[in-house]
């Protein structure tokens, strides 16, 4: 491969790009219109980057200071051209931007489309929009001249595994910026129709803050089809719902409908405009480890960064922008982190988003339930992290419960339905809702009509340790000792115990405790069990069982707390074991360990010692056969 920077050079695409191009050429998408939106979006980004660079280097603008995007059609030659006068690209920029994909989401994108999922929003989401051009073109030429440079370059590819970069004559290149020429496939020539191009550009990209012109055919005059007025500075009363939707799709990289639109202008000590959206579905990067938000920061309509942490991480699903009138255009990364102006914006924006979610929950419960289904697991991170807004977040929180069926339950509704004598909000945490609902630990609560929240997200076990109460009612795990349960009467139709526990049971409980040794901290008669024989619970003031499991799995638990084995003193199996004489000591010892292992299995664990469990079970079966 030549090292002469003036020579034509052919390079192979990275492996991931080659796979991606193959998918685009043999497109899994029925809606190929997306290509124009993506090219216009890239052109608008290039213009915004130039605006930003020109703050410190105004000479880059020369005598052409106004940004613009031009779309040209050439029906006879089956070509469409999208050109901008933005920042432009150098040779290295072209190789980096058009020959490789640096985003970590690329492989995930390939896997998604490789599975045959027809989901147009993936293109925008994963940052591979340029390559959508190969859905309609069998060759793409890109001619670009970097702002301030005396060189121009041409990038060309047929999308079949390689691309070519060569010098371009200055007279054949834009004075500044980038020109993308699509050589259309035969089945895509209809895109050169002026009406179709104009409607596509207006519907998909009429909101971009850069004017767009259309040249219908070679020699025709350019005419304006979008004036470049930023949508967020226009009065809300003048904006149509479809304009909001189009802008949302562009800024969020989604292709669905927004669940909520938040558009306001703050005035007073500082001025800023906000246009933000709660997506209608989960963005692909919602659970990225860095938990970064995607809100963009503008200063007087000049894009600055999308890395300003304008919202707390538990609101990272919100997409949109903030445009400040007070920050300097040359704001630095350090200033972004330390600016009191931005701190005030963050606070105001966060409170507004949470406030609008609260209004949605109050006025449109069904729509809010969908938002919670998509983003509740992320919002609950705020219960752990944001002490200042914890009460506000608790009011937004929704849960499944033993009384909710397939619906969601708010804490205010839970408190309103609490039983007389009930002092706490009871919950049970675990990995699987069905297993929780079948847990013997819930039997005493069901028998008393006490609602229990069923928490199945990993974050649940953490936030309940940080949120002391709601409306004065503490959160309490049903896997911990529940001293007040016996103070709440059974329901009229609940199964009542026929008799008091036999006196021999106390002796049997003491025997079990002795047999199990330090495997448990105690063995107690249970008030909560009505049908099952045994269950494991945590000590009254010990950690929740699920929290302890999560900490242990993460290697952050030095020593696990010993559980309490609760035994139902009225269960027929327990009564039978308690009635055995001294001659059955060995059998009773086996039974004690089997009861403990039964409780472990019901709690979602394995027997303490699989081999010993098997041997004890075999002896039990043999005894039953012998007596049969």
From Swiss-Prot:
Alphabetical keyword list: ATP-binding, Chaperone, Cytoplasm, Nucleotide-binding, Stress response
Record region (A): 1-333
Source domain of life: Bacteria
CDD domains: HATPase_Hsp90-like
Parts of the chain that traverse the membrane: none
Subcellular location: Cytoplasm
GO molecular function, one term: unfolded protein binding
Major localization class: cytoplasm
Region (C): 550-628
GO cellular component, one term: cytoplasm
Region (B): 334-549
Gene3D superfamilies recorded: 3.30.230.80, 3.40.50.11260, Heat shock protein 90, C-terminal domain, Histidine kinase-like ATPase, C-terminal domain
Cross-referenced InterPro entries: HATPase_C_sf (IPR036890), Heat_shock_protein_90_CS (IPR019805), HSP90_C (IPR037196), Hsp90_fam (IPR001404), Hsp90_N (IPR020575), Ribosomal_Su5_D2-typ_SF (IPR020568)
Coiled coil location: none
Subunit: Homodimer.
Family designation: Belongs to the heat shock protein 90 family.
Function: Molecular chaperone. Has ATPase activity.
NCBIfam families (UniProt xref): PRK05218.1 (NF003555)
Official protein name in the record: Chaperone protein HtpG
Organism of derivation: Mesorhizobium japonicum (strain LMG 29417 / CECT 9101 / MAFF 303099)
